[in-house]
Curated annotation (Swiss-Prot):
Residues 56-89 form the KOW domain. This is Large ribosomal subunit protein uL24m. NCBIfam families: rplX_bact. Residues 1-9 form a transit peptide.
Length: 216
């Protein structure tokens, strides 16, 4: 585990109760522009889905059930649990201009729009067709997703962080800080100033005597 991951775990972003989640992460500039301080936005009602019953994860292969791309399959690239959204790579796309100004018309790019959970379905590995799933436990006690039609286990995709690192496959390099080194207590409290500590470490002896000072 890297030191940056430990710092991310320690930092918790506090959001107002009426915050409206979108495609951008709350800490990004785009999300802050859509949720400026003091602005109240209408509430968006979302069907609650518990963490234990959530079925879709980044890297899953799903099939679109409704819309212009119905019947097409793709890989989930983003999950927004606060809105019951999933984003599928290359599907449900719309085109827009990015970076438009008065002097420049901008760049015309394709952007994937979000899909609700009831608009997609997981793929059965047996026949590559959409299927409902159930959460069950294996003999080893592992909780897995099982196809309701064929009984085949649908494995969860390997977790990949936003920086492209897969924790299970990561190997610390010479420049990575280990967990033991990050958690080791090396600071020793002292009443000495920083300059006095440096002098003690380098063996500098102070022979000068402080002059008397007078206050009037």
């Amino acid at each position: 585990m890297r030191l940056t991951l430990l710092l991310e775990m320690a930092a918790k972003l506090k959001l107002p109760h009426d915050y409206r989640f979108g495609m951008s992460r709350p800490s990004t500039l785009a999300a802050k522009r859509r949720n400026p301080p003091g602005k109240r936005r209408s509430k968006v009602f979302v069907e609650p889905v518990s963490k234990e019953e959530w079925q879709y994860f980044r890297g899953d292969t799903v099939e679109v059930l409704h819309g212009k791309d119905a019947g097409k399959q793709g890989k989930v690239t983003q999950v927004v649990r606060a809105r019951n959204w999933v984003v599928v790579d290359g599907l449900n796309t719309h085109f827009r201009y990015v970076g438009r100004t008065d002097e420049y018309r901008g760049t015309y790019v394709a952007s994937e729009g979000p899909l609700l959970l009831n608009q997609v379905s997981l793929i059965d590995p047996t026949d590559r067709k959409p299927t409902e799933i159930e959460w069950r436990y294996t003999e080893e006690g592992e909780r897995v997703r099982v196809s309701a039609r064929s009984g085949r286990i649908i494995p969860k995709p390997v977790l990949q962080r936003r920086d492209g690192i897969i924790p299970e496959q990561w190997k610390d390099g010479p420049k990575d800080t280990s967990v033991e080194d990050a958690l080791e207590r090396t600071y020793v409290p002292s009443l000495k100033t920083f300059q006095e500590e440096i002098m003690e470490k380098t063996g500098i002896a102070e022979n000068r005597r402080h002059r008397k000072s007078y206050w009037y």
